[in-house]
């Protein structure tokens, strides 16, 4: 599927753009009067207060550290060079865009930054390179981006001074906001980090965009986790999202309400996306397919959870290239073909040529949901979105990358890990 370049992001920056149908808008307005939405707003206010109190000293310290890594004439030249579009003169697609990508050294951020650069857009990345998973993988992604002319600033999206400086140096036309604290189970032990990144960080970025001249159009990553305990499948954009099953899901839902408000009050052009279990090369080590691959190759047992009544868990696995092609819209982005976790393991075993040592147990109450299933009809109708990579093909590509990146050879358990 080929998509016109000018359609890949929201229209002219600064214009109000609401993607949902009129009926949906009326439903949202009514929602503000509902008890569930009042709860979400209360959660947001409490979260913002907690974030300020818990992280004030952290922000002061980290801002001083990151400030030492940005600024100066050489740094500004790097920013301008990276942000400059490189489409040929007279291109039918136009002059190109200048895009600020937050979370650029992350899994999805890296792939999106590369795709934007390859089509001739200017790209500047921001990432804090935290230790949620092995930072060396993020640094390797940064090196990959640098080889394609994308400069990634090491900094935190909660640093308003950094964001203001970036918008002062470059009049970005678009912002692709992918920075967030990911993971469902990690939130059980580190709740403050989710409030800090997913709520306070989002607000800091929106404030910077609101004050920028011109105001950039914004695309940001929500999550399929907002559907929470919803038992109606497949999940549709019109389904209820007031039953979060985890703190991560609650922060993403709060983000949707916050962005709606900034669109309503300040006219910011904001488009949100709900990703469904993205996988592929350069992926996140905390994801099941990644950790299964590592443990299978090392001869270690893998833990496979089952739901109530011994029902296998299932996920709507979506290959990264399919996410990239549909990224610039506010729709469910999935594969609409859920696959059970045992089937995922079987496919990995086939491509790794190693039998997994499985340990099957009941799913604990840690915020995970038993299944995800995307209804992509809206994206298909209005965008022409059509995922093309099934799980077997996608995992084959992932395994090829994994074996190469970590230095495995067939039949050997030795690697760089």
Label each region the model flagged:
Residues 2-278, 321, 325, 385, ...:
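N-terminal Rossmann-like NAD(P)+-binding domain of SDR-like oxidoreductases, especially those catalyzing
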Residues 135, 139-142, 256, 290, ...:
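Short, surface-exposed alpha-helical segments at coil->helix boundaries
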Residues 150-152, 270, 302, 356-360:
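Generic structural signal for residues in well-ordered beta-strands
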Residues 229-234, 247, 257-329, 345-352:
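NAD(P)-dependent short-chain dehydrogenase/reductase
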Residues 247, 285-286, 320, 341, ...:
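Amphipathic alpha-helical segment in the mid-to-C-terminal domain
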Residues 307-312, 331, 339-346, 353-371, ...:
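C-terminal "lid/loop" region of Rossmann-like NAD(P)-dependent oxidoreductases
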Residues 323, 327, 333, 344, ...:
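Non-catalytic, hydrophobic alpha-helical segments
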């Amino acid at each position: 599927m080929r998509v016109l370049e000018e359609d890949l992001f929201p229209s002219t920056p600064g214009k109000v753009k609401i993607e949902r149908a009129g009926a949906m808008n009326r439903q949202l307005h009514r929602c503000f009067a509902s008890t569930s939405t009042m709860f979400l707003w209360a959660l947001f206010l409490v979260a913002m207060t907690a974030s300020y109190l818990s992280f004030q000293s952290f922000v002061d310290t980290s801002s001083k550290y990151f400030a030492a890594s940005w600024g100066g004439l050489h740094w500004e030249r790097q920013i301008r060079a990276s942000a400059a579009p490189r489409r040929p003169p007279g291109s039918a697609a136009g002059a190109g865009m200048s895009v600020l990508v937050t979370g650029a050294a992350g899994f999805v951020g890296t792939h999106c930054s590369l795709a934007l650069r390859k089509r001739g857009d200017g790209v500047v990345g921001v990432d804090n390179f935290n230790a949620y998973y092995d930072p060396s993988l993020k640094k390797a992604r940064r090196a990959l981006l640098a080889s394609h002319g994308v400069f990634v600033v090491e900094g935190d999206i909660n640093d308003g001074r950094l964001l203001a400086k970036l918008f002062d140096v470059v009049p970005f036309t678009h912002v692709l906001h992918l920075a967030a604290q990911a993971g469902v189970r990690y939130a059980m032990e580190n709740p403050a980090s989710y409030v800090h990144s997913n709520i306070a960080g989002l607000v800091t970025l929106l404030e910077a965009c609101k004050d920028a001249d011109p105001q950039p159009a914004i695309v940001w990553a929500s999550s399929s986790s907002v559907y929470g305990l919803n038992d109606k499948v497949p999940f549709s954009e019109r389904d209820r999202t007031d039953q979060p099953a985890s703190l991560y899901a609650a922060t993403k839902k709060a983000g949707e309400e916050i962005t709606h408000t900034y669109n309503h009050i300040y006219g910011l052009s904001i488009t949100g996306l709900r990703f469904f279990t993205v996988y592929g090369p350069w992926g996140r080590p905390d994801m099941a397919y990644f950790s299964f691959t590592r443990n299978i190759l090392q001869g270690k047992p893998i833990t496979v959870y089952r739901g109530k009544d011994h029902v296998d868990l299932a996920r709507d696995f979506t290959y990264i290239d399919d996410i990239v092609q549909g990224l610039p819209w506010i729709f469910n982005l999935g594969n609409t073909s859920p696959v059970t976790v045992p089937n995922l393991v079987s496919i990995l075993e086939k491509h790794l040529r190693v039998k997994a040592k499985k340990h099957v147990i009941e799913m604990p109450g840690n915020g995970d949901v038993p299944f995800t299933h995307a209804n992509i009809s809206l994206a298909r109708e209005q965008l022409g979105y059509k995922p093309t990579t099934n799980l077997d093909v996608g995992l084959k590509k992932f395994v090829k990358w994994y074996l190469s990146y970590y230095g495995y050879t067939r039949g050997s358990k030795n690697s760089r890990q």
